[in-house]
Amino acid sequence: MPSFDTVSEANMVEVKNAVDQAGKEISTRFDFKGSDARVEQKDRDLTAYADSEFQLNQVLDVLTGKLVKRNVDVRFLDRGKIEKIGGDKVKQVIKIKNGIETEAAKKIVRIIKDSKMKVQASIQGDAVRVTGAKRDDLQAAMAMLRKEVADLPLEFNNFRD
């Protein structure tokens, strides 16, 4: 029986490349000369540092631009609060989401069941497995999920025939 998995995970290699490129651009830009503006990465956490809130927003604009160029969906980014760290300096922690949360997975299963398509959906950890009798039904389910679930960056993998 054909099936596929619906997942939501960022390509961490591309994220690291984007962070490195953003760091290079920030270090060479004239408006950041003499400032402590930078972006650091630890596992799935990015931390942006700057001298002011305005500069922090510029650093984040550079970072999101680099992420978009490297085909990393910015919906993976979960921005935290802007924190003051001594003097005028500020920082912001950005978490990279991984996996589909249970509420979102239940929403995906409900959308598939409400569509009356000839496919079944089941939650498997942080992924949703969709099975059906025909490949055409699965492709229709993929198209429908792309259209219906706009707030999550979904990927389809592990396609089995």
Curated annotation (Swiss-Prot):
GO MF term list: nucleotide binding
Regions crossing the membrane: none
Q: Which domain of life is it from?
A: Bacteria
Q: Does the keyword Glycosyltransferase apply?
A: no
> What GO CC annotations are associated with the protein?
cytosol
**What InterPro entries does its record include?**
DUF520, UPF0234-like_C, YajQ-like_sf
Tell me where the signal peptide lies: none
The record's similarity note reads:
Belongs to the YajQ family.
Function in brief = Nucleotide-binding protein.
Please report the name of this protein according to its UniProt entry. Nucleotide-binding protein mma_0840
- Organism phylogeny: Bacteria, Pseudomonadati, Pseudomonadota, Betaproteobacteria, Burkholderiales
